[in-house]
Amino acid sequence: MEYFDMRKMSVNLWRNAAGETREICTFPPAKRDFYWRASIASIAANGEFSLFPGMERIVTLLEGGEMLLESADRFNHTLKPLQPFAFAADQVVKAKLTAGQMSMDFNIMTRLDVCKAKVRIAERTFTTFGSCGGVVFVINGAWQLGDKLLTTDQGACWFDGRHTLRLLQPQGKLLFSEINWLAGHSPDQVQ
């Protein structure tokens, strides 16, 4: 289990100067050719998503104005807060800030031939399904994960096992991504 606080994470500026990324984790850890990766991006200007052949990207708007995502003849989609949207990361996708204000989003990318991610918003106590990995990010409220208290802009990632997240207040929201291996794959094969 690895814990993080978005306010204390290192920031990588994009080459096109349209935004920045905070990498949460990758699997396998510290590998350039990852099977899955979680990150938080701040988008300050219109531009294109980086291409990642063979990957699927699920993007979830965390804050800021809505974002229009366009991919040639494939789709035009308005990204709204806390509504995950998946697309192939090997296609050119343009992002346009609809309100002209900076947006922040959560990204999970998975290798299409190895694993599959799901992203949900939780508003009550729950237990993960025992996947190959997962990431949680607190949108608001106070949540207990094991012996650790997580509050707004904090989270955790793991590479295996079942975990219970307890909401400690009457209300709270947590972004939760669970990654599952496709048939014939397991974490033991890649570490």
Curated annotation (Swiss-Prot):
Belongs to the Ves family. This is Protein Ves. It comes from Escherichia coli (strain 55989 / EAEC). CDD domains: cupin_HutD_N (cd20293). It comes from the Bacteria. InterPro entries: RmlC-like_jellyroll, RmlC_Cupin_sf, Uncharacterised_HutD/Ves, Uncharacterised_Ves. Disulfide bonds: none annotated. Pfam families: HutD.
